[in-house]
Amino acid sequence: MPLFHHTQKIMEKVLSVSLLFVTSFVFSQTQIKFDRFTLDNGLKVILHEDHTTPNVVISVLYHVGSKNEKPERTGFAHFFEHLMFEGSENIARGEYDKYVSRAGGALNAYTSQDRTYYYEFLPSNYLELGLWLESERMKHARVDSKGIETQRAVVKEERKQRMDNQPYGTLMEQVFVRLFNKHPYRWMPIGSMEHLDAASDEDYQQFYKDFYLPDNAVLTIAGDINSNTAKLLVEKYFATIPKSTKTIYRPNIVEESLNGPIRDTVYDRVQLPALIIGHRAPAQGSSDYYAVEMLNTLLSNGNSSRIYRSLVDEKQLAIQAGSFQFPLEDPGLGISFGIANMGVNLLDIEKAILEQIEKVQNELISDLELKKLQNQIENQFVNNLSSVEGIAENLAIYETHFGDASLINTEINRYLAVSKEDIQRVARKYFDEKNRLVLFWLPKAN
């Protein structure tokens, strides 16, 4: 073996071991300690003490997303994300936000296909305020005609601004509806404006009664707290809220094989065409999910990733390119894409993306690439847990979707257990032509 290659091999091994050791050491220092208990009404509570700063996060994750909706009443979960700031029996309309801002805090919420998440970030001496606000939301939120009409207008404007009037704004909507035929993942969380208009006040009130329940929620408190004091306050504000009286609806729908490839075209108000390749993907938490995540990191995490380097830097076919999967509770989907450079044929972008996928299908990645992937994943974990906001959200997600909040400290091991052979296997299984959607996104004629 020539000296250069021999030295290069040694340096690769030293570098990869060093990178893995450094990130493993850092991650080992970020083990999250927490207490967990459940109230008699089924509310799960997680407490994490962190006295680094005098702040606290109070969050509630409701296990309801767009997949819990009826096909003729889509958009309800996201609509309630807005409606739940209208107030309650004890909070005047429009005052919810003001309680938090006057305390020097901030608040926010989001809705996905699988969950709705609310949180307040407050100075720690306002812990009781945050708990009272969230208990009001859970116990007797204001669901009336005036609030419903107000939020209908807000949601319609949101759809216009974020989707209808944005280049490629309906891309996810167009991909999901083609990859799912039966499962409620086929519609996006924002749903149908026609469904929201057609719904009665009673429809909205029933949705609240069906899903905004203590036994359908996880309450997380993270930050500068005393756990014993926090427990007493949780019991004070939440223990008397009634639990559900019937089974909470969870869809149990298995899609048939896609029998692709599916090829289709969308015309949109865009200047540059785009090529989107979609595929069905494994459910979050399954063994294949972690291997597909590693594969997507290989293909598109950063400017040195395979798809970006090939399409953007080397061939200059695209101005942007990448690959990712949606972390969904049921089997979901993943997307690879390229936004074309001026004058580039989308067929050339399709060919270039598939070349990178086929390379993984046919050749094992190198040891150095695997170590680099592990390093990137560990860095992501460290970053996600670098704030009390991230800790609170992740504890709630692990408890809700996995039934085990302690995965906040151990899920990384599932990624590190992925082998080169696993990455090749899932590339062949999920990126197969029969499991593929190819979507041509073209400029609409004036």
What are these regions (language model features)?
Residues 48, 53-66, 75-79, 93-138, ...:
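M16 family metallopeptidases and their MPP-like homologs
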Residues 30-49:
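Short N-terminal segments immediately surrounding and downstream of signal-peptide cleavage
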Residues 30-36, 176-217, 227, 249-254, ...:
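Histidine-acidic residue clusters that define the catalytic metal-binding segment
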Residues 12-20:
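Sec-dependent signal peptide recognition
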Residues 74-88:
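Active-site SXXK
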Residues 181, 189, 214, 218-276, ...:
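An aromatic/glycine/proline-enriched structural segment found at the starts
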Residues 1-11:
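N-terminal secretory signal peptides that target proteins for export/translocation
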